[in-house]
Amino acid sequence: MKPRTYAVVDIETTGTNPKEDRIIQFGCVMIESGRITSRFSIDIHPGRKISKQIQHLTGITNQRVQKAPYFEDVAQTIYNLLADTIFVAHNIYFDYNFLNHELMRCGLPSLKIPGIDTVELAQIFLPTEPSFRLADLSESLGFIHENPHQADSDAEVTGQLLLLIEERMRKLPIITLEQIARLSRHTGMDTSRFIYHVLEEMKEKPEPLDPSLEIVDGLALQKKEVELFTSVHYGERTYPRKKQAKEKMFGKTLMYRKEQNRLMN
């Protein structure tokens, strides 16, 4: 997948309907070569009042955006920032579509860049997480999330999440990631292409299989150490011949059977 610059984006809006609502904050972190290289965020005047509900959720007030630029003033800057990048967002379908709607409203073409959804990536590679909400993942994974529901903080944490997921992917056996990649074709936008990209890089410099794993019928499985019997050390004693002595020595380890006792004796 090219290019290799990931633009991790989050937007805050006055609501969820792109035809009626407006962006009030745009946040973006750039990732190259496995690290965050730059950050960009800006408050945006929506041209209307921000509801109390949104103010309470985001902490972005009408007073705060009073002197902020309108989206028309920054649309070209945002478009240029994202051009030739891979768009990443947590629930990409909202951010990508809303942002494109606003760009076209301002007379700019819609973005035609690849997109990756970190919600789907988290569901695949962090399957035991109890919740895939960004705030919950941040708490569970130990990310510092200073201002949930503010675009700059959400973009920062989403960037950290992408890097962590990629790290987890690269620790998987190649044969496991191959199978995940095949199944990932059902994911949205270009999430599957990202998985295939990581897979191809791993194949270029393959790591030896972890010695605790083994390949069985095309699956990388944890080796099982099957203990055929339990050895119990009873000390230097003579073999007990009476029923009472046997029960005292073996306790609940063995069940007393008269015929077996006769054969053992």
Predicted regions: what they are:
Residues Q150-I165:
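Acidic, divalent-metal-coordinating active-site segment for phosphoryl/phosphodiester hydrolysis
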Residues S231-N265:
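Conserved pre-motif I regulatory segment
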Residues E120, F132-D136, E156-Q160:
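Residues on a specific face of well-ordered alpha-helices
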Residues M1-G115, P127-H149:
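Conserved non-catalytic scaffold segment of RNase H-like nuclease domains
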Residues L103, E120-Q123:
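Phosphodiester-processing cores and adjacent nucleic acid-binding clamps
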Residues K2, L164-K242:
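Acidic two-metal-ion nuclease catalytic site recognized across multiple nuclease folds
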